[in-house]
C-alpha cells in the first residue's frame, strides 16, 4: 500500500483494504459452498483452558499464524478467523494503525495457550493491525494454561 504521509488517511485506506479482504474471503467461502463457521473466529472458554495454580509463561514473541481464537464472544463478531476486521471495528483499528505508524511501542497482547495455538484475551485490534501490516510475529504475555 502506498502511504500518503497523512496518518489518518493511511489508516483509513488500510482499514478499507482489510475489510474488503474480509468480504472477499466470505464471498469465496460462499461460492465454494463452505459453511460460514469456517470463517468465524473460534471462541474459547478461559476457565476450561486455564488450570488452577498454573504460572504465567511471561512475555514471548509468538507467530501470528498460531493465534487461532478469542476468549471474548463479542470479538468473534468484529474479526474473522484471520483477524480481518468487520466495519464496526474501524475507529479503534485505525487508532492502533496510527500508533504503529508513528512508532509507538504498544503493550504486548495477552493470550492463553490452546491445543494448537493461542486464544487472545486482550489485543484483538493489535493482532488485526499486525496481520494487515504483514508482520509474522507479535509480542504476547502468555498466561498460564
Q: What role is predicted for each listed range?
A:
Residues 1-132:
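Short, charged/polar connector segments at secondary-structure boundaries
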Residues 135-137:
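Ligand-binding loop in jelly-roll beta-barrel domains
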Residues 140-145:
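Long, charge-dense
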Amino acid at each position: 500500500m502506498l502511504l500518503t504521509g497523512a496518518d489518518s488517511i493511511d489508516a483509513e485506506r488500510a482499514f478499507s483494504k482489510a475489510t474488503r479482504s474480509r468480504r472477499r474471503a466470505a464471498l469465496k467461502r460462499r461460492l465454494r459452498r463452505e459453511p460460514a463457521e469456517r470463517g468465524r473466529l473460534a471462541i474459547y472458554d478461559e476457565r476450561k483452558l486455564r488450570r488452577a495454580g498454573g504460572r504465567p509463561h511471561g512475555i514471548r514473541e509468538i507467530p501470528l499464524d498460531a493465534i487461532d481464537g478469542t476468549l471474548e464472544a463479542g470479538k468473534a463478531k468484529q474479526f474473522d478467523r484471520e483477524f480481518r476486521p468487520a466495519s464496526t471495528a474501524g475507529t479503534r483499528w485505525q487508532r492502533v494503525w496510527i500508533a504503529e505508524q508513528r512508532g509507538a511501542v504498544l503493550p504486548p497482547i495477552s493470550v492463553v495457550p490452546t491445543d494448537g495455538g493461542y486464544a487472545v484475551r486482550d489485543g484483538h485490534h493489535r493482532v488485526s493491525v499486525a496481520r494487515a501490516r504483514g508482520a509474522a510475529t507479535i509480542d504476547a504475555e502468555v498466561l498460564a494454561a
